[in-house]
């Protein structure tokens, strides 16, 4: 008996994805079954966990399992579980639509999806494996009842349709059943006959052998009865379990194939990329646990969103306890996937207890050290390709640990790589930078900015280019944060070339230029004083500098001042920005600066009384160009544009 039947439209992105699945040229269509079995396994895990937590939930957990049912005559394959099930609302949320956080990115990916592996990549990145069923089925029916509820829900859609139906069921077995009305077999299109027992066995063995729950199927086999002349063959049907159910993390690494590890990674991470590195661990003694961790080869699309779920799966004596156990992995390692199986925790442990549990804290410390040691091994390997992939995908995230993990800060610094002026294409480690430092240099020079091009064209770089001094180019938003909190590396302090006074001259050069500096200080003293008063709303000091070679001026901050990029980051996040004025530094050899000095000296009294507006405007232009050159924002861009336009007009 059914009631409350609705026909609903798929979200636009969902329908696009379904079309991609229906017309997919992706050759490995077998993976649809892996996705359905993985979903069923999750549902069984959740039911057992819920039964531990909720004593009012009266469910039978004695025989939790997954069942494959084949109807050869009608070409229907059903994957059934007696797990947690779903409510009507959950069915619509999980199957009828996609997560809103990913729709814009998915729309872009769909428009670019032209390669053979596009379907698999999209499924993995957006966690929507259920849709892979439309690679092999003309129609899909899902029937489900949530544990503890009386009525069920049926969802149904056909290939090519922009709609789906959903209806309430007065009665339904607990759990979820997904029935696929299979397309005709077409081996040229890698579309096999999924009603064949041998094919289903092959897929389960390849992709799902490690699943903890029994995967059962009714199979036909021939038996011989009687003896002698009475001997005869008879076909019987019996239920068989298709998977070995042995947890991979309990097996020695030498006994597990790379293919098994890859499939297990895809199961626990709900991703479709391959693991970059496999990290098995086993600890005995005070705290007994086993772990199997993976470094992914591709960052998920939501790695930097609040919706991203982090943490590894937690088991206790092979009993699933929770997904995304944040207490076992810090935020900056949120990309690490895998399982941890502890021996001495309670089965009904809560997140609140985990936060205070000493054993969990010790396991976490060891896991973090092992992950960082693995990254270090990749970095020091002769073949750098794995490390380069890791750093490209996860370097920005790893550097967040410099702000939060003081115990491992030195290791994080060691395994980090940075762009620098030493090479246009290759990154450098801090150790390599220090090794190249010339004698007498006591600081690691760096500059932050939005892009390499912006940093390299900054006036602050001019003296460093002229002297051949290497500068780290830091363009990730997190760089703005950590460089202010990490004092040094290998005894060398970090020095921003856009903050404080930078002295690149040797003692001999200082002695040789001392007389010239004294002369310049005298010649420019009055101009500097006038500029300081004229621009006092924007700056706190004007001074001469030797850091410029081709630009007339630049702005620098004190050591603890915000950079323009950091100010923008704070404003974008709605945080208050401390009010601070910067220092305007002038190049005493630039024609614009010497010309302004001469013009001021000729009309000093009038200028001091504010009677020479063109000099005031020149001062504003000088300051404005310094702001723009470092990527800053003008307070009154309209006035700056008006003055500049007027000045340019006079030149014609």
UniProtKB/Swiss-Prot annotation:
UniProt keyword terms in alphabetical order: ATP-binding, Chaperone, Cytoplasm, Nucleotide-binding, Stress response
Region (C): 569-652
Residue span of region B: 352-568
GO terms for cellular component: cytoplasm
Subcellular location: Cytoplasm
GO molecular function, one term: ATP-dependent protein folding chaperone
Principal subcellular localization: cytoplasm
Residue numbers spanned by region A: 1-351
Pfam families (alphabetical): HATPase_c_3, HSP90
InterPro entries linked: HATPase_C_sf, HSP90_C, Hsp90_fam, Hsp90_N, Ribosomal_Su5_D2-typ_SF
Protein family membership: Belongs to the heat shock protein 90 family.
NCBIfam families registered for this protein in UniProt: PRK05218.1
Subunit structure comment from the entry: Homodimer.
Family annotation (HAMAP family): HSP90
Role noted for this protein: Molecular chaperone. Has ATPase activity.
Name listed for the protein in its UniProt record: Chaperone protein HtpG
């Amino acid at each position: 008996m059914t009631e409350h039947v609705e026909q609903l439209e798929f979200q636009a992105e969902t329908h696009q994805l379904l079309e991609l699945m229906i017309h997919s040229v992706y050759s490995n269509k077998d993976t649809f079954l892996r996705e359905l079995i993985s979903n069923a396994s999750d549902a069984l895990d959740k039911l057992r966990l819920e039964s531990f937590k909720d004593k009012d939930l009266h469910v039978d957990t004695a025989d939790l399992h997954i069942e494959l049912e084949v109807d050869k005559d009608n070409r229907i394959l059903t994957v059934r579980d007696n797990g947690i099930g779903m409510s009507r609302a959950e069915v619509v949320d999980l199957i009828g639509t996609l997560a809103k956080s990913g729709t814009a990115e998915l729309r872009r990916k769909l428009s670019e999806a032209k390669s053979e592996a596009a379907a698999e990549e999209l499924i993995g990145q957006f966690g929507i494996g259920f849709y892979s069923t439309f690679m092999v089925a003309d129609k899909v029916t899902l029937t489900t009842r949530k544990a503890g509820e009386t009525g069920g829900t049926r969802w149904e859609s056909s290939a090519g349709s922009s709609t789906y139906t959903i209806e309430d069921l007065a009665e339904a077995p607990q759990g979820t059943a997904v029935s696929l009305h299979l397309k005709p077999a077409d081996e040229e299109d890698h579309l096999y006959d999924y009603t064949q027992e041998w094919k289903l066995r092959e897929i389960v063995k390849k992709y799902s052998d490690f699943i903890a729950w029994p995967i059962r199927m009714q199979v036909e086999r021939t038996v011989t009865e009687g003896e002698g002349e009475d001997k005869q063959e008879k076909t019987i049907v019996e239920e068989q379990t298709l998977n070995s159910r042995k947890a991979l993390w309990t097996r020695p690494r030498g006994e597990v194939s790379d293919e098994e590890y890859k499939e297990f990674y895809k199961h626990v991470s709900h991703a479709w990329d391959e693991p970059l590195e496999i990290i098995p661990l086993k600890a005995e003694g005070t705290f007994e646990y086993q772990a199997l961790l993976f470094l992914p080869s591709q960052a998920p699309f939501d790695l930097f969103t609040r919706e991203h779920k982090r943490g590894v799966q937690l088991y206790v004596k092979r009993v699933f306890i929770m997904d995304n156990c944040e207490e076992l992995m810090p935020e900056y390692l949120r990309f690490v996937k895998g399982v941890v199986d502890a021996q001495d925790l309670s089965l009904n442990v809560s997140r609140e207890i985990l936060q205070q549990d000493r054993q969990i804290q010790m396991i976490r410390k060891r896991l973090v050290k092992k992950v960082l040691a693995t990254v270090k091994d990749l970095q020091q390997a002769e073949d750098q390709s794995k490390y380069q992939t890791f750093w490209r995908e996860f370097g920005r995230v790893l550097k967040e640990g410099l702000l939060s993990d003081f115990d491992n800060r030195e290791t994080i610094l060691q395994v980090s790589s940075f762009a620098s002026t030493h090479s246009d294409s290759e990154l450098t480690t801090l150790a390599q930078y220090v090794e190249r430092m010339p004698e007498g240099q006591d600081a690691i020079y760096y500059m932050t900015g939005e892009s390499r091009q912006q940093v390299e064209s900054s006036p602050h770089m001019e003296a460093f280019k002229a002297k051949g001094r290497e500068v780290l180019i830091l363009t990730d938003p997190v760089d703005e944060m950590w460089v202010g909190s990490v004092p040094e590396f290998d005894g060398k302090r970090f020095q921003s070339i856009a903050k404080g006074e930078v002295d690149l001259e040797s003692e001999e050069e200082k002695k040789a230029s001392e007389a010239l500096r004294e002369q310049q200080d005298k010649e420019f003293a009055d101009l500097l004083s006038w500029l300081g008063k004229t621009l006092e709303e924007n700056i706190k000091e004007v001074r001469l500098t030797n850091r410029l070679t081709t630009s007339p001026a630049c702005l620098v901050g004190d050591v603890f001042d915000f950079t323009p990029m950091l100010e923008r980051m704070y404003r974008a996040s709605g945080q208050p920005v401390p009010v601070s004025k910067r220092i305007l530094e002038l190049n005493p050899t630039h024609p614009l600066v010497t010309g302004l000095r001469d013009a001021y000296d000729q009309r000093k009294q009038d200028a001091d009384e504010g009677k020479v507006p063109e000099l005031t405007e020149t001062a504003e232009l000088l300051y404005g160009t310094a702001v723009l050159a470092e990527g800053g924002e003008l307070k009154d861009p309209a006035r700056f544009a008006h003055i500049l336009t007027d000045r340019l007009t006079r030149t014609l």
